[in-house]
Amino acid sequence: VVGRTVEKHYITAIDDYVARTKHFISFDMEVIPELKNTKSLSAEQQKEKEGELILKALQPGDVVVLLDEHGKEFRSIEFADWVERKMHTVNKRLVFIIGGPYGFAPKVYEAAQEKISLSKMTFSHQMIRLIFVEQLYRAMTILNNNPYHHE
C-alpha cells in the first residue's frame, strides 16, 4: 500500500478485517511511505518514485498482483476460488499492491504477474484498502464455509 491510512474509522475497520483474516492465513499489510514535496513532481515522476519504493519492498519469488482499474474483475466467490488456486501454486509470498493516486509506473507493471480490479467504479485510496481486506476476509470465510458470505 502506498501511503498510510489517515481516516480513523478506516483504520479501525481495516485493522479489524486484518485481524479476522489472520485467523485463516498469514497476512500483513505493508505501507510504503507517501512521497514528500510532490507538488513539484509530475504524475509520471511521482509514479516512478513510488515505483522504486514498491520494487524495493519486493522479495525474489514474490507473486505480484496489482489492484488496478484495468485488471480482471471477480464476483466474491470467483475471487475466493482464485485466491485458493494461488495459495496452492505460489511458493513464496502472494503480494497485492495498491498504488498511489496516479497508478503504477511501467516498471511496476512489468514486475506484476496479474492485475485485478475490485470495481469499475473509482474509490478513494483510503476506501479501497478497506474494500480489499474485507474481500480477502470474505474469500477466506467462503473457502472455510463460515457463515459470513451470502449469495
Where are these regions (language model features)?
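S-adenosyl-L-methionine/SAH cofactor-binding core of RNA-modifying enzymes
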Residues: 26-92
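N-terminal beta1-alpha1 ligand-phosphate binding loop
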Residues: 1-21
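Conserved nucleotide-binding/hydrolysis micro-motifs of P-loop NTPases
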Residues: 5-7, 35, 71, 102-103
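Conserved RecA-like P-loop NTPase ATPase core
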Residues: 65, 99, 132
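Catalytic beta-strand/loop module used to bind and position nucleotide/cofactor moieties
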Residues: 68-70, 75-107, 112-123
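Structured adenosyl-cofactor binding patch, chiefly the S-adenosyl-L-methionine
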Residues: 106-150
